[in-house]
Amino acid sequence: MGVTVAIDCMGGDHGPAVTVPAARAFLRNHPEARIVLVGRQDALEQAMGAIGNGFGERLSLRAASEVIAMDDPPAIAMRSKKDSSMRVAIDLVKSGEAQAAVSAGNTGALMAISRFVLKTLPGIDRPAIATILPTRKGQTYVLDLGANVDCLPEHLLQFGIMGAMLVSAVEHLDRPTVGLLNIGEEAIKGNEVVKRAAELLKTSGLNFYGNVEGDDIYKGTTDVVVCDGFVGNVALKTSEGLAQMLATFLREEFSRNLLSKAMALIAMPALKRFKHRVDHRRYNGAALLGLRGVVVKSHGSADAFAFEQAIHRAAEAASNRLIERITERMTAMGVAA
């Protein structure tokens, strides 16, 4: 994995306190990789001074004088903060100094800046946000998760292509299955956009499974689930809320009385395995697909372990030629300009 990843160290809730240790952990696990830490010089030097370097030229610093706040409007962040850590990290991908960028910062600003600097791939109208969700069978990739609230059938087709190429690249599956999220499996179900998208996906050459319902996401029915950003974001946030509720219920029940606490001790090994399987930190890192460069968005509240997963996803996508795979597929379908 001999790639260079640029990291926006100032983004997210914790800034360098998380991003710098995560970068070091990633480099320890990937001896051929390189990282460029982008941020305010004083903040980076302070973070590096506390934990040291030890990686020589594999870990370098790039100064950026500005920081994009989580509540900055995307348009203002793009126009007025051209020396922000986020913008400089994306610029490094544009120039070829890095093959991927990772940020835990403002999602809207990251999408706007990435699209402005890197541009979209030939044949792709709109970038989409794709992430991994755990399933009974392992995991599935879902897109779009909020970048595109309203979509045309052609956009959903493009999402299917990009999602399939992402899974092919990072999971090494030749023909990943693609499902279209709908209110029923039958072809007559859904609105006109979804019905037309299903027709396009059927003739796309992708391994199109057909319509899938919400429960199919966690059954692992398909490797990729396609939907518009409105539906995808609601599905994601609903899932997160359900997971938090179940975790709260478990804590309350196992701490209700002495007998419950004793049962909790007995069940601890199984509970730890359960926690590992559903640990959202393991799935951190949403890819911004459709750009002429690899960009991954980390959750803003990510800890060092979770942020390291986002770095790994970015490096893996870049080293496995994700951008080239999408371009080649679009060209083969005759839709790349």
UniProtKB/Swiss-Prot annotation:
Reported function: Catalyzes the reversible formation of acyl-phosphate (acyl-PO(4)) from acyl-[acyl-carrier-protein] (acyl-ACP). This enzyme utilizes acyl-ACP as fatty acyl donor, but not acyl-CoA.
Residues passing through the membrane, by range: none
Pfam families in the record: FA_synthesis
Protein name as catalogued: Phosphate acyltransferase
HAMAP family (UniProt xref): PlsX
Record key words, sorted: Cytoplasm, Lipid biosynthesis, Lipid metabolism, Phospholipid biosynthesis, Phospholipid metabolism, Transferase
Alphabetical list of InterPro entries matching this protein: FA_synthesis (IPR003664), Phospholipid_synth_PlsX-like (IPR012281)
Natural source organism: Aromatoleum aromaticum (strain DSM 19018 / LMG 30748 / EbN1)
Subcellular location: Cytoplasm
Gene Ontology biological process terms in this record: fatty acid biosynthetic process; phospholipid biosynthetic process
EC number(s) per entry: 2.3.1.274
GO molecular function: phosphate:acyl-[acyl carrier protein] acyltransferase activity
Catalytic activity: a fatty acyl-[ACP] + phosphate = an acyl phosphate + holo-[ACP]
GO cellular component: cytoplasm
Main localization category: cytoplasm
Pathway linked to the protein: Lipid metabolism; phospholipid metabolism
PANTHER family, sorted: FATTY ACID/PHOSPHOLIPID SYNTHESIS PROTEIN PLSX, PHOSPHATE ACYLTRANSFERASE
Family statement drawn from the similarity comment of this UniProt entry: Belongs to the PlsX family.
Subunit structure: Homodimer. Probably interacts with PlsY.
Enzyme class: transferase
